[in-house]
UniProtKB/Swiss-Prot annotation:
Organism, scientific name: Mus spicilegus (Steppe mouse)
Family annotation (InterPro entries): AHR/AHRR, AHR_bHLH, bHLH_dom, HLH_DNA-bd_sf, PAC, PAS, PAS-like_dom_sf, PAS_fold
GO cellular component, one term: cytoplasm
SUPFAM superfamilies: HLH, helix-loop-helix DNA-binding domain, PYP-like sensor domain (PAS domain)
Region annotated DNA-binding, chain positions: 37-65
Gene responsible for this protein: Ahr
GO molecular function: E-box binding; Hsp90 protein binding; nuclear receptor activity; protein heterodimerization activity; protein homodimerization activity; RNA polymerase II-specific DNA-binding transcription factor binding; sequence-specific double-stranded DNA binding; TBP-class protein binding
Localization per Swiss-Prot or TrEMBL: Cytoplasm; Nucleus
Stated name of the protein: Aryl hydrocarbon receptor
GO biological process terms held by the UniProt record: cellular response to 2,3,7,8-tetrachlorodibenzodioxine; cellular response to 3-methylcholanthrene; cellular response to cAMP; cellular response to forskolin; cellular response to molecule of bacterial origin; circadian regulation of gene expression; negative regulation of DNA-templated transcription; negative regulation of inflammatory response
Length: 854
């Protein structure tokens, strides 16, 4: 008890004094002392009575004689109440049911009650009409800091704020109108609380127990010893008045009194707790230390959280051995503050748990006095999460004058006495650290420092507790590794311009072999510390060893190799060209376009899969072998390239006598290997039709790269101007339209030479042939529309034969084209003009007579 001016509040109870050492028996014998024998018998009975109390052993060991008697009376009264309130069944009274089954049921009920108390946001409190605490649940310690044994059978007014005592007394009365007058109500503030109720009611004078006005819901402030409060905690009481049976109280005349009303309530904090408080409210533990912080005791929760037994904690020596080296100076500062002021204040640090694990805790230590002198230290710790601990660590680093956080402060007037374990950078792991590397050249010995000093505690710590566990090993999936390797290099740097798909395949296989060699280094290379590695433990539990991993890798490698070898025999319809391949090709084209510098560009050869290449060659050979119904049209290819955004004045241009539609945006197209084309004399009567070009030697020097979409015939059936062509990129079917004469094309395409060429709404008669995506419809030439600035498209060709003239135009002439939106690329209806600009030196070039077809 701590008393003030007419105010008394509950405080920490007096504990059982330390047992004195037994004096040796004198040689002359034991002297007869009846008083001493009586005290010894009394102490023995009290110890036996204390052992029967339903409290943990650590609580019983701290009880004094008066507390043992008080708790014994309280236990007997509670047992009498439950004997009446929870009446047993007739079978139980007669012993008809199995005793073992009854014990199991009682144990299950006990466990359920414990779980309910833990889930409850508050504690259970039963207060009699004379203001005595009849029962308080053990969870009261989590909210008020009082032990259950400290408050049972004590006056409740010692816990209530002096301004709220009158309200609590009013709530205890069944009519909310206590019989005491104002003067007696003032007695609530007296040192011993209000007087006991002198008026006892009979059941006839009291209302029924289940009446609605017997319910209670009110608020008051209770004394709180926890560090996160100001000394009082506002609580909400919700419950009802019920009869307290089985007390067997007697009046002054010796007559048995009827049961009286008592308040059965649940007290909950007004401010709801946070999620972290809910999680950690049941993990607050306390430790007892000597004045030099040597542990001498720990409660059951502390042993559960830290993993140590009380013997292991008390036999290690200084308590600083359990504190992280980066927190030692911070805790030492709080230790000195506690010695000076009696309380350390809130201190956040890391405690060493069992199995070399660190736990962030928030601690507050108090100095306990005995006979006016400091005797020992009681520390209350609350576990924190790692995020909370790091947040406090950052605040500490910013506020303190030197680095408590990393241990860089100077101790014992030596410069940097700490070993490399204190170095925050780089992070050291078990895989790259050995005991020899850890030890400095001149490590101070343990004997050179005081046993209770910080340096001695630091040296006694094992350096393995500061080693981080090794990072997880590389994944064993060969597809993941091959995908990562393939994304690291560009196609331009990895392969030669004249290479083929075999080079790409060989390169990927080489990477896979390197990965397999790296992964086949064995357990010693892949797992530096097998015993402490989680993956190794999982593999061992599943019965998988490193030989199995190598076998799976080899099987995957041969499966991939055999699939690639047999790709040429797969039907063309079964080839699955995924979005990943198309995306990768498009990204490669974008990268190559960005590398262009002025008019020079390094030649880049686009490689595709061998399966597509072989299939396309086979299809084209079959087309050439079939006799055409009419004169064969020359097989050409249309390119679609990514163009840089430049505004130039476009013109309409005929290349080799045909009109090409170039897409200014990068479409997703098939890239096919170039094939040598044959020349056919189709329109020998037309003027300006050139079958032999004087620019053939310059084909290989063209600094442009071109993506081609395969096509057998660029001429399509007639379409309306308003119809936009949209051909699928995978399913190709021959046209079913009737055949027309080739002379119709001549009449449609012959226009005066001095006119610009545009697009007419009239459709052209075309000769049907098998076509693929990328082939565009042809229309009659009309005067071109007004010139508008459009984007620039760059392309180049590397094909022999009839494309020599196209290469010459690219290298020496500047041609700009403007087309209607009808000739835009497939799927791009938003583009109003199509264009083609060849990036080359601007030189005058005479008009080309329109003739010939692509």
């Amino acid at each position: 008890m701590s008393s003030g001016a007419n105010i008394t509040y509950a405080s920490r109870k007096r504990r059982k004094p330390v047992q004195k050492t037994v004096k040796p028996i004198p040689a002359e014998g034991i002297k007869s002392n009846p008083s001493k024998r009586h005290r010894d018998r009394l102490n023995t009975e009290l110890d036996r009575l204390a052992s029967l109390l339903p409290f943990p052993q650590d609580v019983i060991n701290k009880l004094d004689k008066l507390s043992v008697l008080r708790l014994s009376v309280s236990y007997l009264r509670a047992k009498s109440f439950f004997d009446v309130a929870l009446k047993s069944t007739p079978a139980d009274r007669n012993g008809g049911q199995d005793q073992c089954r009854a014990q199991i049921r009682d144990w299950q009920d006990l466990q359920e009650g414990e779980f309910l108390l833990q889930a409850l946001n508050g504690f259970v409190l039963v207060v009699t009409a004379d203001a005595l605490v009849f029962y308080a649940s053990s969870t009261i310690q989590d909210y008020l800091g009082f032990q259950q044994s400290d408050v049972i059978h004590q006056s409740v007014y010692e816990l209530i704020h002096t301004e709220d005592r009158a309200e609590f007394q009013r709530q205890l009365h069944w009519a909310l109108n206590p019989s005491q007058c104002t003067d007696s109500a003032q007695g609530v503030d007296e040192a011993h609380g209000p007087p006991q109720a002198a008026v006892y009611y009979t059941p006839d004078q009291l209302p029924p127990e289940n009446a609605s006005f017997m319910e209670r819901c009110f608020r008051c402030r209770l004394r709180c010893l926890l560090d996160n409060s100001s000394g009082f905690l506002a609580m909400n009481f919700q419950g009802r008045l019920k009869y307290l049976h089985g007390q067997n109280k007697k009046g002054k005349d010796g007559a048995l009194l009827p049961p009286q009303l008592a308040l059965f309530a649940i007290a909950t904090p007004l401010q709801p707790p946070s999620i972290l408080e809910i999680r950690t409210k049941n993990f607050i533990f306390r430790t007892k230390h000597k004045l030099d912080f040597t542990p001498i005791g720990c409660d059951a929760k502390g042993q559960l959280i830290l993993g140590y037994t009380e013997v292991e904690l008390c036999t290690r020596g200084s308590g600083y051995q359990f504190i992280h080296a980066a927190d030692m100076l911070h805790c030492a500062e709080s230790h000195i503050r506690m010695i000076k002021t009696g309380e350390s204040g809130m201190t956040v640090f890391r405690l060493l748990a069992k199995h070399s694990r660190w736990r962030w805790v928030q601690s507050n230590a108090r100095l306990i006095y005995r006979n006016g002198r400091p005797d020992y230290i009681i520390a209350t710790q609350r576990p924190l999460t790692d995020e909370e601990g790091r947040e406090h660590l950052q605040k500490r680093s910013m506020s303190l004058p030197f680095m408590f956080a990393t241990g860089e402060a100077v101790l014992y007037e030596i410069s940097s006495p700490f070993s490399p374990i204190m170095d925050p950078l780089p992070i050291r792991t078990k895989s790259n650290t050995s005991r020899k590397d850890w030890a400095p050249q001149s490590t101070p010995s343990k004997d050179s420092f005081h046993p209770s000093s910080l340096m001695s505690a630091l040296i006694q710590q094992d350096e393995s507790i500061y080693l981080c566990p090794p990072s997880s090993p590389a994944p064993l999936d060969s597809h993941f590794l091959m995908g990562s390797v393939s994304k690291c290099g560009s196609w331009q740097d990895s392969f030669a311009a004249t290479g083929s798909e075999a080079a790409l395949k060989h390169e990927q296989i080489g990477h896979a072999q390197d990965v397999n060699l790296a992964l086949s280094g064995g357990p010693s290379e892949l797992f530096p510390d097998n015993k402490n590695n989680d993956l190794y433990s999982i593999m061992r539990n599943l019965g998988i060893d490193f030989e199995d991993i190598r076998s799976m890798q080899n099987e995957e490698f041969f499966r991939t190799d055999s699939t690639a070898a047999a790709a040429g025999e797969v039907d063309f319809k079964d080839i699955d060209i995924t979005d990943e391949i198309l995306t990768y090709v498009q990204d490669s084209l974008n990268n190559s376009t960005l590398l262009n510098s002025a008019c020079q560009q390094q030649p880049v050869t686009q490689h595709l899969s061998c399966m597509l290449q072989e299939r396309l060659q086979l299809e084209q050979q079959q087309q050439l072998q079939q006799p055409p119904p009419q004169a064969l049209e020359p097989q050409q290819q249309l390119c679609q390239m990514v163009c840089p955004q430049q505004d130039l004045g476009p013109k309409h241009t005929q290349i080799n006598g045909t009109f090409a539609s170039w897409n200014p945006t990068p479409p997703v197209s098939f890239n096919c290997p170039q094939q040598e084309l044959k020349h056919y004399q189709l329109f020998s009567s037309l003027q300006g039709t050139a079958q032999e070009f004087p620019y053939k030697p310059e084909v290989d020097s063209v600094p442009y790269t071109q993506n081609f979409a395969p096509c057998n015939q660029p001429l399509l059936p007639e379409h309306s101007k308003s119809v936009q062509l949209d051909f699928p990129g995978r399913d190709f079917e021959p046209s079913l339209h009737p055949t027309t004469s080739n002379l119709d094309f001549v009449s449609c395409l012959q226009v005066p030479e001095n006119q610009s060429h545009g697009i007419n709404s009239q459709s052209a008669m075309v000769s049907p042939q098998a076509y693929y995506a990328g082939a565009m419809s042809m229309y009659q030439c009309q005067p071109g529309p007004q010139r508008t600035p459009v984007d620039q498209t760059q392309y180049s060709s590397e094909i022999p034969g009839s494309q020599a003239f196209l290469s010459k135009v690219q290298s020496r002439g500047v041609f700009n084209e403007t087309y209607s939106s009808d000739l835009s690329s497939i799927g791009h209806a938003a583009q109003t003009t199509g264009h083609l600009h060849h990036l080359a030196e601007a030189q005058p070039l005479p008009d080309i007579t329109p003739g010939g077809f692509l």
